[in-house]
Amino acid sequence: MSFTTRSTTFSTNYRSLGSVRTPSQRVRPASSAASVYAGAGGSGSRISVSRSVWGGSVGSAGLAGMGGIQTEKETMQDLNDRLASYLDKVKSLETENRRLESKIREHLEKKGPQGVRDWGHYFKIIEDLRAQIFANSVDNARIVLQIDNARLAADDFRVKYETELAMRQSVESDIHGLRKVVDDTNITRLQLETEIEALKEELLFMKKNHEEEVQGLEAQIASSGLTVEVDAPKSQDLSKIMADIRAQYEALAQKNREELDKYWSQQIEESTTVVTTKSAEIRDAETTLTELRRTLQTLEIDLDSMKNQNINLENSLGDVEARYKAQMEQLNGVLLHLESELAQTRAEGQRQAQEYEALLNIKVKLEAEIATYRRLLEDGEDFSLNDALDSSNSMQTVQKTTTRKIVDGRVVSETNDTRVLRH
């Protein structure tokens, strides 16, 4: 049996590539300020652009940045196109003015001799109008640019407004709580004032009763004709006492009011400080949240692309597996068919070999008998019957050698070698 082995060699040529320079890219914020200035006559146009640039490598989080750069470029291109159109319009108006001036001169030359009328003041008016037209064109371009800048500033202020609105709502909630405390303080103050009024009325009533009792006693003394001298201390001035009490209560109320004002002013200052601190922390947290959201969006986009790539690879793998499975089934069918044919061929070969061996034995026997008969006929009387019997009883061995060459499970060639051995 001989076997052939097929080997396939794949060679890959690598060619060195030249160094490729990749231009550096920067991510710029969407906010920018631009100004346009055009000189007289449409010449010397100058465009100045100021942007706040934040350096950053272009990576997975650079999609929003690239969109902002594209928007800026489109905006500046639009402004430049508008400015160019205005300048072209100014130039066309100047050309039209020169054409009209030439027509006026030709008309004057045809109608009458030169120098009849002085058109200098008209030329001055024309120059003034031309200057006004150019100034208006420049003003229009400047206004358009200011409108665009105002739109960008409005967007910035909108963001600031939303931030300040959140801060204002927080402060309003704090103020609402403080107003409740102030209302409670006012209620307490009203209660104290009511008590003061009640005490005043009670004091007046007691003073009136005291005066009536004094008058009654004086009348009794006068009617009895007695003179009674009482060594008593001088009566106190009730109005002065009331004034002192009122002053004390007012001083106490003023002191309480000042203490409350001071306390709530301090509380408001502390609340304002806390609100300012919390606002800064909130802004930092919002910035961090924005960056995290941008990173999350970038990662989600990468994940979606990876999922799509994985799905495509799985589909390709399924197609390849199905194709190779079909090929393997086909090859297995061919192999089974070849194995069955090989088994049939081997069985047929064995059967033919057995038949050939039987026929060969018969042939050998016949040849031996023919040789014996030939010797009997040729030798005649010299060949005895015993010799013929010995010749016929002699033992013969037939040696058969079969050589087959099989390549890839298929019989390519077959060689048979037969030898007869006598004993």
Curated annotation (Swiss-Prot):
Name recorded for this polypeptide: Keratin, type I cytoskeletal 18
N6-acetyllysine modified-residue sites: 124
GO molecular function terms listed in the Swiss-Prot or TrEMBL record: scaffold protein binding; structural molecule activity
Site note Stutter, residues: 264, 324
Region Coil 1A: start-end pairs: 72-107
Physiological role: When phosphorylated, plays a role in filament reorganization. Involved in the delivery of mutated CFTR to the plasma membrane. Involved in the uptake of thrombin-antithrombin complexes by hepatic cells. Together with KRT8, is involved in interleukin-6 (IL-6)-mediated barrier protection.
The IF rod domain, residue ranges: 72-384
High-level lineage: Eukaryota, Metazoa, Chordata, Craniata, Vertebrata
Organism: Mus musculus
Xref: SMART domains: Filament
Position(s), cross-link Glycyl lysine isopeptide (Lys-Gly) (interchain with G-Cter in SUMO2): 73, 240, 363, 365
Linker 1: annotated span: 108-125
Modified residues (Phosphotyrosine): 37
